[in-house]
Amino acid sequence: MSYEDSPIIGIDWGTSSLRAWLLDSKGSVNNFYTGAHGISQIADKDFAAVLALVLGELGPKARNAPIIMCGMIGSAQGWRDAGYLQKSAGIAELAAAAIPLQDAPSVWIVPGVQSVSADGLADVMRGEETALAGVMASQKITEGLFCLPGTHSKWVVIEDSQITSLSTFMTGELFQLMRQHSILSPLMPELEQGASDEGFIQGLELAAGKLGLLHQLFAVRAGILTGQFNPVSAASILSGLAIGSEIKHISGLAQAQPTPLFLNAAGVMAHLYQTALAHFNIECQLIDGEEASRAGLYEIARQIL
């Protein structure tokens, strides 16, 4: 069957949520859906039922359109394990290694990528490789350092279109665990109306200290109890501490790069990371994270189809 003029459905299906785009044959967005249908939220692993829901939300044009998926849906806990590529970052390599679903016609899952961290340890990513490939293809980038914030933030060094280093920080997950399930939890308001820039900066300053994250986490508690920190800004302080600790430890790698850092983010996350990077004197070029994922899925689909 030829899909040359067919619309395409691209899905970034992660641990806690998914994003789906209905794209025309040129890559323009006809419809978009997002929901809290991450693989960890689907107790019976009935991924086919969730996909049917998504297709219904995207409308009649989604019927019979080929589907390209990336992210944790391709993990051992997902629909089918798509494996990992070794260091490859290009559209062609990801498309060639994408696996079809036997129980769902015209559906492919993009593999993840494995590499080594700046410390020489094994590291992996799923979903971010598609955004990275989309940026590299659309902006003709063949080298540089990329930051892809998230639950697990990724820092990727590209040389000659290949991944030479991949370092993951559990920044977002640590923030949520500490906010919801730690001794800090009772000190934080149930609902903080947006991020407090003042509190976030306090967290960044705390992260720059000498004694490290394990001490600094308790310092948030002590600071609130003694009046050093405003409890209303507690979550923002914790956010600044988590992101600041991440950037402090990667700053040497960032400052050694010949070109500005590429920050792949959008919305509040883009603002927080731009603020934190500036605090640590690191220049960055902002790239729209949602657009990057969409472009990557579209380009991979065109290679497959």
Region spans (language model):
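Short glycine-aspartate micro-motif
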Residues: 8-12, 66-68, 144-148, 262
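ATP-binding/phosphotransfer module of carbohydrate and carboxylate kinases, centering on a glycine-rich
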Residues: 18, 183-305
